[in-house]
Amino acid sequence: MSASAVEIANLLYRYAELLDAGDLPGMAALFRHARIKVAEDGPTIGADKLLDLFDARVKRHACGTPRTRHVITNPIIEIDEAAHRATARSYYTVLQAADGLALQPIAAGRYHDAFERVDGTWRFAFRDYTLFDFAGDLRYHLNESPAG
């Protein structure tokens, strides 16, 4: 795997790590230069709106975290080194355990991302959050269920 591919994959994994730690501002900061698609027919949003959305929707438990593990798998990373651009398609599975909820998968879907390299560093340029494929018991994770 090239150095660029490792750096991009680490952005995918860092997102999951921050979200699972309950660090929503840190998670949103990964997208400070990105446009984010959260609705099939709506406009894209920026990092500030993403933080507002997650802050309103994601339940935090007494420990300050959502008590989840976002497992990012199967990243297919395509890089144009000369243009300083890349795309990635990956799967996610969200596991959760909480008081009253045994450890189980609660959601699965896909991320389609675009990246740009600026001053030698890769960063998110775009994320599509609309590719939500399967839902389990989301009562302990979200304050409201996702559409679709």
Descriptions of predicted regions:
Residues 1-30:
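Short, low-complexity N-terminal intrinsically disordered segments enriched in polar/charged residues
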Residues 24-92:
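A solvent-exposed, acidic/Ser-Thr-rich amphipathic alpha-helical stretch
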Residues 63-148:
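A beta-strand edge to alpha-helix "cap/lid" segment located at domain peripheries
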